[in-house]
Amino acid sequence: MAHQNNNVFDLSINLKKVEDTNKIEKIYTYNSSVVKSSDFIGKLNIVFFEAKDLDIIIGNPSYRRRFLDIHISQQDISYLKSLQRYNKVLQSRNRILKDIKARKSSKNELEYWTEKLIQDGIKISKLRKKKLEEISTETLKIFPKLSKNNEKLTIRFIPSFKNISSLNMEDLTTIFNENFDKEISNGSTFLGPHKDDFEIQINDKNSSEFSSRGQIRTATLSIKLGEANALKNSLSDTPIIVLDDILSELDFDRRKTVVNFIREYEQIFLTSPDDSLIKSIVERDDKIFNVNNGNV
């Protein structure tokens, strides 16, 4: 059962084993009705932090794009639809490029898919840039409070379309026309949101290459909390924050700093396999839930 904006609704995810396979199927329900996983997005705004989120800094660009896409989709369902359309068009366009190379299709057929790709591509990349700037603004307020040292954090968007803010349909059509032969030779689309990326730097050095594990963890947590603040500013509603085992790799001073800071948020779920860590930070109004073999 969830409460948001004075509305009450029931969200659940059930796991079901698929017969004669080792696969597990997820069944999503919203107010007792079975829905698609994408229908969950935006129903309840949550910012979730786990160890895997360090890939925002050290992982490949696809993880950073996914981070942005989930963040934006929680605020704008039309963005999610544009992204879904774009991915389908991208698949079709890449197939046509391969067919042209094999002399099974013509360049004329490619023009239709290029136009469709650009239409959604412009919206996606421009919105990613805007929303990353919002996250960055909030993150830069948080990072100095969580970092032990006087460190400088920088977040920089790297769009596939250069100068994306000033480009229009005509500009991008020209750019694609200039790259047709290379794309046909390669059998794939060179430009577009599927190539977007962003970079995090600490003290003007790429964090993925030059930062310590502690710096990366602090920067990632700052980004996730910056995301929460950006969501709150956009939706006028504070998201639920779930922090999965963030304390175990922090020293005592940094752990104390993080815990004191996150208490500013309205609703937080903090998990740890070490109950002594939880007990060391608990206060009178906090609630502790013990989970054993899936039972609370």
Show where each model-derived region lies.
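Walker B catalytic acidic pair
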Residues: 244-246
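Long, charged N-terminal accessory/stalk domains
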Residues: 55-56, 63-108, 115, 123
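A structural signal for short hydrophobic beta-strand segments in well-ordered beta-sheet cores
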Residues: 13, 288-291
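Nucleotide-state sensing region of NTPase/ATPase domains
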Residues: 1-63, 69-75, 79, 140, ...
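Hydrophobic/aromatic beta-strand patches that form the interior of the parallel beta-sheet core
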Residues: 47, 269, 287-289
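Active-site donor-binding loop signature of nucleotide-sugar glycosyltransferases
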Residues: 51, 157, 291-293
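H-loop/switch region of ABC-family ATPase nucleotide-binding domains
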Residues: 271-274
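Conserved NTPase motor "head" modules and their coupling/switch loops across ABC/AAA+ ATPases, GTPases
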Residues: 101-240, 249, 253, 257-260, ...
